[in-house]
Structures are given as structure tokens and as C-alpha cells.
Amino acid sequence: MTAPWRRLRSLVWEYWAGLLVCAFWIPDSRGMPHVIRIGGIFEYADGPNAQVMNAEEHAFRFSANIINRNRTLLPNTTLTYDIQRIHFHDSFEATKKACDQLALGVVAIFGPSQGSCTNAVQSICNALEVPHIQLRWKHHPLDNKDTFYVNLYPDYASLSHAILDLVQYLKWRSATVVYDDSTGLIRLQELIMAPSRYNIRLKIRQLPIDSDDSRPLLKEMKRGREFRIIFDCSHTMAAQILKQAMAMGMMTEYYHFIFTTLDLYALDLEPYRYSGVNLTGFRILNVDNPHVSAIVEKWSMERLQAAPRSESGLLDGVMMTDAALLYDAVHIVSVCYQRAPQMTVNSLQCHRHKAWRFGGRFMNFIKEAQWEGLTGRIVFNKTSGLRTDFDLDIISLKEDGLEKVGVWSPADGLNITEVAKGRGPNVTDSLTNRSLIVTTVLEEPFVMFRKSDRTLYGNDRFEGYCIDLLKELAHILGFSYEIRLVEDGKYGAQDDKGQWNGMVKELIDHKADLAVAPLTITHVREKAIDFSKPFMTLGVSILYRKPNGTNPSVFSFLNPLSPDIWMYVLLAYLGVSCVLFVIARFSPYEWYDAHPCNPGSEVVENNFTLLNSFWFGMGSLMQQGSELMPKALSTRIIGGIWWFFTLIIISSYTANLAAFLTVERMESPIDSADDLAKQTKIEYGAVKDGATMTFFKKSKISTFEKMWAFMSSKPSALVKNNEEGIQRALTADYALLMESTTIEYVTQRNCNLTQIGGLIDSKGYGIGTPMGSPYRDKITIAILQLQEEDKLHIMKEKWWRGSGCPEEENKEASALGIQKIGGIFIVLAAGLVLSVLVAVGEFVYKLRKTAEREQRSFCSTVADEIRFSLTCQRRVKHKPQPPMMVKTDAVINMHTFNDRRLPGKDSMACSTSLAPVFP
């Protein structure tokens, strides 16, 4: 019996122990009321916001029901609620409703959302120390001493910083900020102060007050080409703006809209998915969490069973941010109340000003709470009660709908996901199946009308280099296009008022998506439009008519050496001859015995008289012998150096003479831009409003400034297009400044034109796109691909290679005409005439001396001499009677200039060395 008894005693002990545990548990459970009451004050309206107000009230009930069904959160406790409705901005009614709820013993009051009503309720809650839960943004002054509130809406200082980080990531340099009411300027302070710290230009605009029609403002922004716009407005206004922007043609890929509302995901964006517009927003609802997705799905099922929605632009059954925040707020209050045992709630009277004794303790529990709710991580600032730590999803509109492309948090900043990294969150993904408008201008060989016997339409009307380039780009990127000629036929330039024309204007006005033409990439144009990488490099040069060949002169044989060289050669000849004469007189080795057969001869002679010295130099220069040979070392040095000098001169002359006489020289009056600037006889200019004109207009180089002053002073210097300039260059004394590629094409087909000089500058042709176009990078990549495949070079060879000008005849083997070497015959004739004149002089002089010596008349002597000279067969004639030879001092002195006596001898010479004395 002992064992059964012990077993019975054990069972009794367990029974009493269980009763004891229950006795201790019952007081704790009784410390928490069986019913917890919360209060909600919501505005109601009859307009488009009525559905939103109903959604907030529904979210309040929805969250309470979820908590009551989840018995693990509040065991043995039922969460009840009291809902009061007030009119918008009726703060008196809000105060009365709040006092009514406090009299019921609520532990917290949720709402209202409007500013004046919120302030009224917050004052009462702060006085009676009852937590006030706020769900909308509210401006809290720095001196605000109210502490009994928390706000689940993200702090707008942090949200403004998120917008600024996104703007910096997108590399915006200018943007327009559009706000709904004056509080928007407060909310966006961080962004508005950005220009003082960052290189961003902001334009601030306000939406119309008391009107949903934003079309006048949109029209003004469209006219001002404001493509990057930040809208700070409600989701209702955002839906209206998108609809009106669509009607005004602003929902294109060139516009980028950022909406600050956290309900962008709740809007019906189906009509805009394929528009190409860049639409970016923020979302705090954590849809990536499976638990959140389940709650949102349950919410949608209940909302879809309600009455059909009005035309507010919202998706059916979507849970908006306010509803999600309210859901999280109710859960936070419930969790905090569970963690605050032994807390009782009393009925509070507003007129008694007696605070809830557990209010401060409960408020601290709420501010210290950390909760992972529908809107992500919830943490409050313990001092301000604001939600400063949260995660924001960056969402962007794609063809498949809104997609998450990044995350922002106050701690980590902006983090763009790998899918979108490197291309911005809202760039159009592909050009496939897109139809683009292409503007161009007629310019050979880039764009030309196709010659055909039949009528052509559309893109088939055109051909040329740019047309082939456009076809290749369309093949690579998969887009279709429509070619349109620019209305004014101009490339694009700014006037004095800063207004653009031509293709640039059409890109600015978004009348075209691409400008495919020989459009030069310039600094000024880059400020108005975007360019792809250049598909062709070039420079400015001069187109001028080909100069005619110069008429050869009869003295063309003098051309191989310049006049300066001829003068220097003449001076060298005279100088060397004189120096040779002087040195030969001083050198003893140049004197020789003229009569070596006579040992007693005392006279020596010197061959290098002044005339002989000149004759020696002339013979060497003409490469002919003079029969005068220097004997002394000094004179031989002079002779050798002179021979070397004449060798180089004659060889150079001979080599250059062939080129000058056999090749026709083409002399142009200008050889460079400097030559143009220095003269005014030849008129010069460029295409009006073209890149070349802009280059000279903006240039700071003195030569180009001088040229622009000339062109601007003469309106006729600027031509309308290249065709007009080419015709003027052919028919008038006119030089056209244009791109080297066009000059190359023109000179291949017109042999009367040529390029003068080299390139004045270096630049490139690029494909133009509107500013901020998503197509630019894709076009650039395709151009680089064509360049690597050598297709750009092949296309250029196709369109630039012409029949070409006929090759000039080979002048090396051509016969020389009299017009080139006739001067040689003139020199020969002149030499003959001169020799005849000298011979006549010698003849007359000699006969006069003979007549005097023979004592005959001069005429008879001349007649006899002429008669003898005309007798060509006779080679011998009688020598005149020799004079009597005498030795005199006069004779000796007469020969001392060329002869000198041998030292130590008497002054006696052979009879043959003595000068004759004529009586």
C-alpha cells in the first residue's frame, strides 16, 4: 500500500501547486484590462479625396481586426476603437471630438491629418499626457515643446536629402521644382539650398492654387525647355499632372519627372508605360517582405469587395502609404501597451486638465519601440518623436510597369541596384521597334535626292553617306525612322538674342529625335543639344579656283636661282678675281722668266694681270679652260676653293634648271589663311549660320578675328549654302572657307577647284540628339562598332571616290619650247653683237695707228685692210714696217708693271723683250 499512497500524495501536491501558480498568474492578467480602446479622428470630404479618407478609416478598422484575430499579440485583451469624423480644417470640431474620446478612456488618438486640426488635437493630448499618433507630414518648429506625439511619416528633411542624392546621381545640372502649397518650400529646404553647395541650377514654380488645371504651367515649362522636373504634390494632383502632360505631348523620353509623393506606386500608370517618359518616385511600403505581401493582399481583397472607386487615378484595391502607416501605428501602440503592465486607463476630462498618470510612461514606451512593419523599419527619435531612420525604395516606370531600381537610407545613402547601375534609373531600355524622326539637310555627298525615272516617296527619296550611316544604325539598334528636311535649310546657329535655328532648333523643340547630317560638334551647340561621338573628323580649309599656269619668260633659265643668289655669285666672282690679282702680285712664285733661253735676261713676268684674273674666274665659272694656271700655293688655294664653289653652284643650277624648265609652275595668289587676312582683293567667306562661320565669329586668334571682321563687314561674303559658295569660287575671285571633307568631295569632281593650304582647325561631325536624350549613348556605341568594322571608311570611299581629274602629262620628257629657253639665244645674240662691236673698235683703233706709222691716209689704209679681209682664201699678209728698237728708260718703266728685273743684273733686256718705239 505504500507505493499507491505515495502516488496519491504526489497527485495532490501537483494539484495544489497548480492552484498556487494560477493564484500568482491571475493578478498579472488582471493588470492588463480586458478591453483597450483607441481613438481615431478622420476628415471626410465629398470630392476626389473622399475615397482616401474612407481608406484611412478602413485601415484603422482593418488593423484592429488583425490584432484581435492574432491572439498572441494581446492575449485575453480586445482592442476596440472609437472613430470620429470631422470636416476639413474644422479645428473646433476636432477639439470636441478629441475630448469625447478622452472621456471614453482611449490610450492614444490617431489623426487627424490636416494641419490646423492636428495642432488642436496635439495640444489637448500634450496637456492631458495622452500619446498622439500622427501619420502625415507636419512642420514642427524648433521651439516646439509638445512631447506627447510621434509621427510615422518619414522626416521630410531626410526625404529631401534622398531627392538631392538622386539628382546628383542622375548628374542633373539644372532642374525645376514645382510645389503644391507653401509647405512644400519647407519640406524641400535641403534641395532648395543645393545650388549654394552644388553646381545645380534650380527654378522654383508653384502649381495653380484652388485649381487642378496645371496645363498653363506645363505649357510654360515646355516652352522654356524644362525637361527635368521635381513635383512636390499629392498623389491626386500627380495623377492630374500626368494626364495633362500626356495630352500636351510631354510624356516622352526627353522628360524626366520625379514625384515626392510616396503613393506613386498606387497610381494607374498603364497609359504611360510605352511613352518612354522617365518617371521616378519613392516607396516606403516594403513589398519585398512576404509577410507584408500577405497583409497587402488581404487588404486588397477586402477593398475590392467595397464600393467601386471613383475616377481618382488609383489602382483598384491598392494599399496606400497612409493606410500602411496607420496599420503600423496601431500595431506599435498595441505592442507597447502589452509591454507596459500594471497600467490602467481612466476617463479624462478636458476641462479638468488632469493628466493621465501613466501617459508619460506609455509615451516613452512608444518612442523607444522598434518595429518591422509594412513600411519597413520603424524607429523614432526619442527627442523629437520623428521617424528619421527608414528605407526608401527608388522606383522607376518601365515598359513592364514600376520597378525597384535602388534603395535609399539616411545611413547608407543612395544605392542603385546592379540592373540599373551605369545607365540611370529611368533610361529607356531599348530602341527596338521605336520610330524616330530624323532631321537633315541637303548636302553632297552626305544627303542628296536620289535620281530615278519614277516618283519616289518617303525615305527612298534620299541617298548619300548619312543615309547609309542611318541605315547601318537602324540595323544595329533595331529602330525605324522617318527622314525630314529641315524647314529653313540651316544647320543651326544662335542669333544675337540667343535663339537657335536650323536642325539644332528642331532638336531643342523636340520636333526631331536625331539630326543625321554633316553637323559639326561645337562648344556652343553642346550647350543646347547632345552629340554622339564623331563619325568623321575634319577641319576648316580654303576652297579656291585652281591657278592657271604662269606664262614662261624668255629668261626662265634664270629662275633656278633667286635674284639674291645671282647677285651673291656676281659679287663672289668680282671678289675672288680681285683677291687673286693682289695675291699673285705679292707672291714671288707667280713671277717667271719669260725668256729662259736667254741666260742674261733680267726681266720676269706675271700672268695674272687684272684682266687675266677676271678671265680666270670667268673660265672656271663657265667650266671652261682659261690657259692660266696658278703656280704659287696661295693662288692655287684660291683657285681650288673657287672651283669647288663653282662646282656646287653649277651643279645646283643644272639640277634645278630641269625642274624649272620642264614642269609648269602653278602660282596661286594665296597659300594660307594668313595670306587671305593680309589682302582685300580676293573676297572670302563661309556658309551663313554654319559651324565654320561660328568658328571665326568666336575665335580669339588675331588672324581669324581679322578675317571675321572682313566677312561681317561685307554681307556678300557669307553665302546661303555650299552650292552658292562653290559657284562663286568658280566664277569670281572668291575663296570659300568650308570643311575639308566637302572640299575633298568637290575637288574630286571639279578640276578647276583646289584646296589651299592645310587645316585651320580640327573637329568632327556627330549625330545630334535633344538634350538628355536616352538615345545618345546607344548611337555612340553603334558608331564605334561601325568604326571598328571599318564600315565608316568603306562608306566614305563609296561616296567620295569620283572619276577624278585627269592626270597631268609627264613634263620630264617633253620638248622645251622657245618660250622657256629663248633667253639663251638672246644672250648669245647679245654676245655676238658685242663681239662685233669690239672687233670694229679694235679694227679702227689698229688701222689708225698703222696709218700714222706708215704715214698713209686713214681711208686708204681702211680700204686696203677691208679688201684683204674680204679675200677669204688668203691667210698671209705683209707685216707692217717694224719700228727702230732703242733702249730707253721710258720703255723700261712702261714694262715694270708686268715685268721686273732679275736682282743683281743690269737693266738690259733682249731685243725681243724691248718695247718698240714708234717715231
UniProtKB/Swiss-Prot annotation:
Membrane-spanning intervals of the chain: 564-584, 637-657, 821-841
Protein name: Glutamate receptor ionotropic, kainate 3
A single GO cellular-component term on record: dendrite
MF GO annotations: adenylate cyclase inhibiting G protein-coupled glutamate receptor activity; glutamate receptor activity; glutamate-gated calcium ion channel activity; glutamate-gated receptor activity; kainate selective glutamate receptor activity; ligand-gated monoatomic ion channel activity involved in regulation of presynaptic membrane potential; transmitter-gated monoatomic ion channel activity involved in regulation of postsynaptic membrane potential
Biological role stated in the UniProt entry: Ionotropic glutamate receptor that functions as a cation-permeable ligand-gated ion channel, gated by L-glutamate and the glutamatergic agonist kainic acid. Binding of the excitatory neurotransmitter L-glutamate induces a conformation change, leading to the opening of the cation channel, and thereby converts the chemical signal to an electrical impulse. The receptor then desensitizes rapidly and enters a transient inactive state, characterized by the presence of bound agonist.
Annotated signal peptide: 1-31
Further remarks about this protein from its record: The postsynaptic actions of Glu are mediated by a variety of receptors that are named according to their selective agonists. This receptor binds domoate > kainate >> L-glutamate = quisqualate >> AMPA = NMDA.
Catalyzed chemical reaction(s): Ca(2+)(in) = Ca(2+)(out)
Record keywords: Cell membrane, Disulfide bond, Glycoprotein, Ion channel, Ion transport, Isopeptide bond, Ligand-gated ion channel, Membrane, Phosphoprotein, Postsynaptic cell membrane, Receptor, Signal, Synapse, Transmembrane, Transmembrane helix, Transport, Ubl conjugation
The organism's taxonomic lineage, starting at the top: Eukaryota, Metazoa, Chordata, Craniata, Vertebrata
Cross-link Glycyl lysine isopeptide (Lys-Gly) (interchain with G-Cter in SUMO1) residue location(s): K887
Binding residues for L-glutamate: P518, T520, R525, A691, T692, E739
Membrane topology of the entry: Multi-pass membrane protein
Location of the protein in the cell: Cell membrane; Postsynaptic cell membrane
Sites of Phosphoserine modification: S869
Disulfide bonds: C99-C350
Family of this protein: Belongs to the glutamate-gated ion channel (TC 1.A.10.1) family. GRIK3 subfamily.
Superkingdom classification of source: Eukaryota
Residues exposed to the Extracellular side: 32-563, 658-820
Ranges per topology, Cytoplasmic: 585-636, 842-919
Gene Ontology biological-process entries: G protein-coupled glutamate receptor signaling pathway; glutamate receptor signaling pathway; modulation of chemical synaptic transmission; negative regulation of synaptic transmission, glutamatergic; regulation of membrane potential; synaptic transmission, glutamatergic
Principal location class: membrane
Quaternary structure and partners: Homotetramer, and heterotetramer with either GRIK4 or GRIK5. Can form functional heteromeric receptors with GRIK2. Interacts with PRKCABP. Interacts with NETO2.
Glycosylated sites: N70, N76, N278, N381, N415, N426, N433, N548, N551, N752
Gene3D superfamilies (alphabetical): 1.10.287.70, 3.40.50.2300, Periplasmic binding protein-like II (3.40.190.10)
Result when mutating D391H: In a breast cancer sample; somatic mutation
